[in-house]
């Protein structure tokens, strides 16, 4: 899969998930994609490659629970820790808990993320001539 295709899909999924957070007045609304730090973008591109890539059927998370577990591991690997109040600078996140302990809105957000990845996988394609 082209890196450009992965980037297109990543931006689509990220921005759509961000809009969902805004629309539902979520307690944490991600900053714009352009403002995300490089380690986050790198791990997010890996998630999108796994969820949407050519061989994604064998690798992708198929349930919100599975996706959340992968997300937690990625955040722990980037040095984030659990804390009740979100702090991007200190890498503290209240959602670093088992899926069953998440508020309903956060569990729903993971289900929407899987749906957005499926939309990106099926509908975001490179033009015939590429970029």
Describe the predicted segments one by one:
Residues 1-131:
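Alpha-helical propensity feature that highlights long, continuous alpha-helices across diverse contexts
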